[in-house]
Amino acid sequence: MCIRDSHNRREGMKEALTDVEEGADIIMVKPAMSYLDMVSEVSKAVNVPVATYSVSGEYAMVKAAAKMGWIDEERIMCEMAVSAYRAGAQIYLTYYAKELAKCMDEGRIG
């Protein structure tokens, strides 16, 4: 099941609960950063893992802002992951997977 473009929280929650009742073994919420409230609510309401996907547009925004010197790309990349997990995601999918794994291996992110 995937919650996306759900501008109505109640409708998104209803979809998630229905999908779990129908046998879904995971709930995917995307885009990650825009829907952290849904990640939090869904993770509290279902008994299956909640995954979130940081979509290509989020990746492109961070890359572009870093290229302009407006942000620290690594810091933002790490904060995005921490935010997803803090919201309740058990799985975080990102285009930054390799870079994020390196930061975790080096102890720069828990």
Map each language-model feature to its residues.
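Hydrophobic faces of well-ordered beta-strands that scaffold small-molecule active sites
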Residues: 27-29, 50-53, 92-94
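Conserved, mostly hydrophobic/aromatic
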Residues: 19, 42, 84
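Conserved small/polar residues in nucleotide/adenosyl-binding loops
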Residues: 1-5
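Generic hydrophobic/aromatic pocket-lining and core-packing "Φ" positions
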Residues: 13-16, 39, 81
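Internal helix-turn-beta structural module
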Residues: 67-93
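Alpha-helix-loop-beta-strand connector modules within alpha/beta enzyme cores
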Residues: 35-63, 109-110
